Amino acid sequence: MDLFKQLEYRGMVKDVSDLELAKQLLNEQKIKFYVGYDPTGESLTVGHLVQIVRMLYLQKHGHTPVVLIGGGTGLIGDPRETSERSLLTLEKSLENAQKIENQIKGLIKGNVEFVNNYEWLSKIDLISFLRDYGKHFSVSYMLHKDTVQKRLESGISYTEFSYMILQSIDWLNLYQNRDVKIQFGGSDQWGNLTSGLELIRRVLGKNDAVGLSSPLLLKADGTKFGKSESGALWLDKELTSPYELYQYFLNSSDTDIEQFLKLLTLIEQDEIEAILETHREKPELRHAQKVLAKAVVELVHGKEELETALQVTEALFSGEFNGLTKSAYKTLESVIDVVRFNGESLIELVVKSKLASSNREAREFISNGAISIQGEKITDSMYNVGETSKAFDTYAIIRRGKKKYALIVF
């Protein structure tokens, strides 16, 4: 199966500006292609993984990704369907841009190029912008773009209205100076992709470039992919732990699992089909979900963080915390109830840990042998908690029975 058909199999193709040219470039040549990221936040989210995995997949087949970080366009803001974006300061835009570049460098290694459009957009004066670029865009053409249409009633500023011109300048710049032949983006970027192709044609009188969009990833129930109850799922482990990421994908529905395996992993087609077949035989074992969760966490955070996520998952499932690594204990701090030890008595600590509702109840639990710390059953209510055995001189698990526990941090 050729590369373009592989992209179609994976659900990575929605709109293509020139189908035959796209097939020729991807199947018969080794080309440069680009994907752009505006630094609207300090981290990318799991929603960005679709484009990242596609870059990795094309790189694997000999093409060169060019990652454009929008330090310039981030100052303007891509029009949203609902309301105007808050403007970033130059300092914040460039700071976010550097963080996102570093994040992507951790994901895409080897033959890859990075550019920041602030380098060229910041050098264009207003007169040059209007004469050299603005003259190639008719207002009626711009008004017909979906993102603009959806904002006409509620209002759109000239700042955001001009965003497509800036992104088109990016496309022209990369086509002229880096021989970039394809721009990839989500289907919500289709208007910007085609505007860039039109600018190349008008300025250079030719156009052998291609725009290619992918469907926006929605879950089977129609909700947006990449959101949890606590909000966005970030690729920065300080914002979303590898354990949380693992749990998100482990809990994927059976109806979502096939598209997630195709869009968010580099697992090849034959193996994906085998995984799905095994899963269909015994869906209650959640085989496909486990493969997916492992693949995504390892891709984003590496093997070591995956092992930590697996350790914590197993500990919480089994109720056994022996042998955890320091990293696993650190993860537990954000997952289960945590109590900071400040010299409390055992009775006070049991109440503080929410394992008892009162001192009297705590005393009963202790005398009945229901309380243990770090696996040691405690029956003496006068026990000195400070002398307990600690993992890494910092952590201990206090528990009542098998399923009620908390993490003590000394």
Swiss-Prot record:
UniProt catalytic activity: tRNA(Tyr) + L-tyrosine + ATP = L-tyrosyl-tRNA(Tyr) + AMP + diphosphate + H(+)
Binding residues annotated for ATP, in chain numbering: K227
Gene3D superfamilies named among the record's database cross-references: HUPs, RNA-binding S4 domain, Tyrosyl-Transfer RNA Synthetase
Positions occupied by motif 'HIGH' region: 39-48
Enzyme's top EC category: ligase
Domain S4 RNA-binding: 344-410
EC annotation from Swiss-Prot or TrEMBL: 6.1.1.1
Subcellular location: Cytoplasm
Positions with a binding annotation for L-tyrosine: Y34, Y163, Q167
Keywords: Aminoacyl-tRNA synthetase, ATP-binding, Cytoplasm, Ligase, Nucleotide-binding, Protein biosynthesis, RNA-binding
Family membership noted in the UniProt record: Belongs to the class-I aminoacyl-tRNA synthetase family. TyrS type 1 subfamily.
Protein name: Tyrosine--tRNA ligase
The organism of origin for this protein: Acholeplasma laidlawii (strain PG-8A)
Lineage, highest ranks first: Bacteria, Bacillati, Mycoplasmatota, Mollicutes, Acholeplasmatales
Name of the coding gene: tyrS
